[in-house]
């Protein structure tokens, strides 16, 4: 069971995301319902360690067995999701991921994968051009240039809730 709480006032999500970089590019994704890019990852399951959750999500979404280098950020976000219009309070752990032992780069600059009923499109985005991309969370556009050695708590609020 995913750690999600739905109420009449909004939703709470407990998530993990992977920061996968190569040659000055960041791997981002979107699906057929989202006009914006976001990072690979997903919801943490009840009683699941965040480290296990990110590796599971990367296996599910990308079919890779990756390794965690280190945690980077814990971000608390408050926003209204643009497609569903739901109000969210989200806690997300971001991990720097090593995919050097995977054949991920052989898939090309842009590739798709099926995830149940959804088609996920993955794309390597040049980090120098992120400021012009429709990418969430927005703090990544700036902080990607200064990856912390130790986890940092960040807060991002995109809307008055």
Identify the meaning behind each predicted range.
Residues 1-17:
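Acidic, metal-coordinating catalytic segment for phosphate/diphosphate chemistry
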Residues 65-74:
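A short coil-to-beta-strand element that immediately follows conserved catalytic motifs
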Residues 22-60:
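Conserved Nudix-box catalytic region and its N-terminal flanking loop in Nudix hydrolases
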Residues 35-37, 103-105, 110-161:
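Nudix hydrolase/Nudix homology domain
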Residues 79-107, 143:
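Active-site-adjacent beta-strand/loop module that shapes the phosphate/pyrophosphate-binding cleft
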Residues 20, 96-98, 123-126:
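Short, well-ordered beta-strand micro-motif
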Residues 24-26, 34, 45, 74-79, ...:
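Short, charged/polar surface micro-motifs in flexible loops or helix N-caps
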Residues 8-12, 85-91, 114-119:
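A generic structural micro-feature
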């Amino acid at each position: 069971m995913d750690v999600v709480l739905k109420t009449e006032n909004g939703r709470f999500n407990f998530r993990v995301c992977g920061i996968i970089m190569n040659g000055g590019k960041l791997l981002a994704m979107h699906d057929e319902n989202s006009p914006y890019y976001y990072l690979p990852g997903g919801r943490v399951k009840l009683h699941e360690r965040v480290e296990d959750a990110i590796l599971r999500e990367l296996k599910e979404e990308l079919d890779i067995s990756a390794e965690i280098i280190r945690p980077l950020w814990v971000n608390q976000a408050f926003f209204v999701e643009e497609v569903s219009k739901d109000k969210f309070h989200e806690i997300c752990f971001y991990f720097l991921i090593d995919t050097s032992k995977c054949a991920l780069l052989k898939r090309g600059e842009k590739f798709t994968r099926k995830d149940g009923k959804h088609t996920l499109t993955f794309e390597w985005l040049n980090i120098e051009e992120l400021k012009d991309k429709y990418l969430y969370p927005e703090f990544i556009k700036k902080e990607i240039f200064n990856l912390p050695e130790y986890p940092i708590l960040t807060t991002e609020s995109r809307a008055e809730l």
